[in-house]
């Protein structure tokens, strides 16, 4: 027995309405929509509108181009000139509201940079230089304002110069220049402070800090280097003079040592590379350099070559007389007493002895008269003589002053390792590795010693050994994965957009519309007003998304018809109950079937 969907509230003959619904399928959707409550109608319309809006947004997102920053920030950039340059070149752009970055399309990034650069737009700092002096000054400008403008201009120019150094992103310079005074007690020296903002992950070398200090100190009159302070953006003091000098000296010594080692290593390469080939040996040189400053003074004497430097002679002769002696005066100028001749000569004195100061007599006993003075000659008094000679001799002396130069090579160590020599068999062409002989290693050792200036007295060491090298493994350059390519993400966006639209259509819109239109079909098929309305269950009861649902037949006492999957017995019992409750309508349905068959 065929199954049927019957609506007991529809008149038995209503073929006109059934034909109208069949001719216009959308009327069933509107009919079912009108039978819903107002809240469900609003919810359905809002859901449909939201689905369409989301689908439209996904399509726009998939078609949206990739934007990249032209400037990470508009700080220090004339935004008006940048926008004018991009607009004139017809390059679309947008500004990121959170970071303030200026974004352009990835395809237009290179062209945008060229256009902006050709327009003369470049990032600049906010420092004001000497261009502040180009402005017209008011008639009543005071000397203080003029001095302040000059100081601001000098600070700006110094900040720009410091900012041009590597690793320095921006800089600010503050100058404290006191007013000059004619009084010495009021004289004050100027000072300066420099704040440097470094790039992330960068730092300044001690030599660069000293360069900044010297640059600022020589740009301001009477500014001493000790009065310049350099600080970074983290508050670290960079201009500690003592530490800077020590670090600078240590850095110079380290660089000098590395340069010396590099020069000696290059000499070894120049000797071994033509003989062994590239990559067949490894050489390293270690130099012990003495940077101590030594000053010495030596004085040497040669006693074999004396020289008379000075001579002093002193001859003294003294005679005893009875003349005036003592302190000059009345007491010392008294005349001498009368001379008294001895009454009897001593036995020891000779016969012709004349006492000192007595007149001399000749052999005849006559007094000898001095012809010049006409006075008698007197016997001389005793005389004391002394001769003293002082001679100073100068020895041969040599004084030498020696100052050893810093950077003296104290010791040198050279290490060379040789790979096995390669032998090619002339017959088979096979390559074999053989170690070097002792004589060949000794020959290479002598070559290396001569190339680096080997000095045994200095304690230099040169080691040349033979060891097989590990086989070199070629490093494969990893290709860029496809998922990192820009085109891949463009395709992914397109595919995701299409998938989202398909899910939205077939997963949301279609089930909703099927539920609505399916309910209308059930009611139109259950209506008894026409041939098309009274269809058998076998023709349409299994169609649509409601084929497995239980269908309600409206009437005074509603009867639920079983679904086709519940079996033939359940359907038969439901039809029997329907015939028992409303036999007239069942008879009308049978008549419609008969008329349809004829």
From Swiss-Prot:
The M ring may be actively involved in energy transduction. The keyword Lipid biosynthesis does not apply. Residues 310-319, 383-392 have a biased composition (Basic and acidic residues). InterPro entries: AMP-bd_C_sf, Flag_M-ring_C, FlgMring_FliF, FliF_N_dom, YscJ/FliF. The lineage of its organism: Bacteria, Pseudomonadati, Pseudomonadota, Gammaproteobacteria, Pseudomonadales. The chain crosses the membrane at residues 42-62, 488-508. This is Flagellar M-ring protein. GO terms for biological process: bacterial-type flagellum-dependent cell motility. It comes from the Bacteria. GO terms for cellular component: bacterial-type flagellum basal body, MS ring; plasma membrane. It is a multi-pass membrane protein. Residues 296-392 are annotated as: Disordered.
